[in-house]
């Protein structure tokens, strides 16, 4: 829903981080801060409560993070608080990771199989995906017994579903249409 705005914030922060050669540091810090917000019930309630003033939220963030993270990253978080966007931090992190991948001509391919791929299967899959997308592939393998067999691949919005589970679903649909 807010992907466009998340991307604008992410690009702005990425440009700052890149100029400082701190992209990985910023992403790691943002993930830790996001985890802290999600896992600390009090902090989460403070941030999500519209009745708590922006000034109070800024004071709380300052007391927690001011001397613990890079000053420019801290300033970015304060801007998010002032613009009432701090609750969108997860989306901003996803977007900054996408920007970083794009700038390194990389793409993530999520691969689901019932059993782990062997080295030759992994290499062949990476080679085919690199040709198709003309980018370096970062393979994220997931073992998923529910697919029964075959391979499921997601690259961005593209899905290649060669699973037995999908074939069964397609046959069910055909049976209901003809039946």
Curated annotation (Swiss-Prot):
SUPFAM superfamilies: N-terminal domain of the delta subunit of the F1F0-ATP synthase. It comes from the Bacteria. Keywords: ATP synthesis, Cell membrane, CF(1), Hydrogen ion transport, Ion transport, Membrane, Transport. Its main location: membrane. PROSITE patterns: ATPASE_DELTA. The keyword Transmembrane helix does not apply. One of its GO terms (cellular component) is plasma membrane. GO terms for molecular function: proton-transporting ATP synthase activity, rotational mechanism. It is found in: Cell membrane. It is a peripheral membrane protein. F-type ATPases have 2 components, F(1) - the catalytic core - and F(0) - the membrane proton channel. F(1) has five subunits: alpha(3), beta(3), gamma(1), delta(1), epsilon(1). F(0) has three main subunits: a(1), b(2) and c(10-14). The alpha and beta chains form an alternating ring which encloses part of the gamma chain. F(1) is attached to F(0) by a central stalk formed by the gamma and epsilon chains, while a peripheral stalk is formed by the delta and b chains. Belongs to the ATPase delta chain family. F(1)F(0) ATP synthase produces ATP from ADP in the presence of a proton or sodium gradient. F-type ATPases consist of two structural domains, F(1) containing the extramembraneous catalytic core and F(0) containing the membrane proton channel, linked together by a central stalk and a peripheral stalk. During catalysis, ATP synthesis in the catalytic domain of F(1) is coupled via a rotary mechanism of the central stalk subunits to proton translocation. PANTHER family: ATP SYNTHASE DELTA CHAIN. This is ATP synthase subunit delta. It comes from Clostridium pasteurianum.
